A protein has these predicted regions:
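Terminal-region recognition feature
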Residues: 1-235
Length: 235
């Protein structure tokens, strides 16, 4: 007998594309963190800079300035500009607190000129020697309105002739003559101012300024330079 060859056919199924795995989201937790809001940063009103600014602004609001550094061009710009602002027709008093080792005689002259302009406009110019008024600072102090020159009890004041410091050694004889003449003009001007501001004679002022002459508040009052000895407070 012939054997029957039976072949079995299997139906081929088309391969289906595999499903993409689903992304598993993390489980949500009930206690969500609240968004943290940045804290507002406020300026520290008690910092050194803030307090200094507050004090400076207070004094300026009372028409008061401090000459408490070397009397140089920077001080000139500050003091003269501020004093000029107060030549405003109000005739309100102006207060100058002083604690300075001195400095430029030209700057002192500019400040004194502005003080006299304030007086001419009807304002009294109070000068208050807090600790030390030396050299050019002593001239500014003395130029205050008579009767309005205060000194703290322990304050000192020092007068001497004007001088040039740190002059270049490489100078001609003509240059030295120019410096000498400038000093003579400045010293004559300051001597006249002190005679008018005090009870001293011209000879007494010249003798005082011929050297470094230091005075206590009481001694300066006897000379007619200080009017009142007390700690001064703004009205």
């Amino acid at each position: 007998m012939k054997s029957l060859n039976v072949t079995r056919t299997t139906s081929k199924k088309k391969a289906e594309p595999a499903e993409e795995p689903k992304k598993v989201e993390p489980a949500k937790t009930e206690d969500k963190k609240k968004e943290e809001k940045p804290e507002k940063q406020t300026a520290n009103m008690y910092s050194a800079d803030s307090m200094a600014s507050f004090v400076d602004n207070y004094f300026l609001s009372q028409r008061a300035i401090w000459i408490d550094t070397d009397i140089d061009t920077e001080m000139c710009s500050y003091a003269v500009r501020q004093l000029n602002l107060w030549i405003d027709g109000t005739k309100l008093p102006v207060y100058i607190f002083i604690n300075s080792p001195g400095g430029s005689m030209h700057v002192a002259s500019a400040i004194v000129d502005t003080m006299k302009a304030l007086e001419a406009a009807g304002s009294k110019v109070y000068t208050i020697n807090v600790a030390m008024a030396a050299s050019a600072a002593a001239i500014i102090y003395s130029a205050g309105t008579k009767g309005c020159r205060y000194s703290y009890p322990s304050a000192r004041i020092m007068f001497h002739q004007g001088r040039y410091i740190g002059i270049d050694a490489d100078l001609k004889a003509e240059d030295l003559e120019i410096y000498k003449r400038e000093l003579e003009i400045a010293n004559e001007m300051f001597t006249t101012l002190l005679v008018n501001a005090s009870g001293m004679t011209l000879a007494e002022v010249k003798a005082m300024m011929s050297k470094d002459s230091y005075f206590s508040a009481k001694e300066a009052k006897k000379l007619g330079i200080v009017d009142k000895i007390q700690v001064f407070t703004l009205p």
